[in-house]
């Protein structure tokens, strides 16, 4: 992320995006493992729609990572949607479907995903000016950031 399309982008922005790309890559790995090896998946009987949603993350997580790495504003939007819906889906599975009480690994994981979602949504307005806009010419930034 230090050459090419990222050359003029501040180091802080590159670091935040790199962490986000790693989060989505990790999420991809987790969801692929859970899909291929069910013994590592949730130990609950999930409704069909929730199972389909979690399986779909094997597509949406890597797509968000690729779009973010390519500096596409669509990656920011998709990243926000994926993390927010993943936090909500895990919240439903953890607090509605799981009869366990107290602190559980599922609740810790759900809290982490929620924190990531809140953080990514909060950083998005700061990151957006450095991303390539979807409207207009390819290769142009959404707006020219002002140096202060």
Predicted region positions:
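Topology signature of small-to-medium multi-pass alpha-helical membrane proteins
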Residues: 1-148
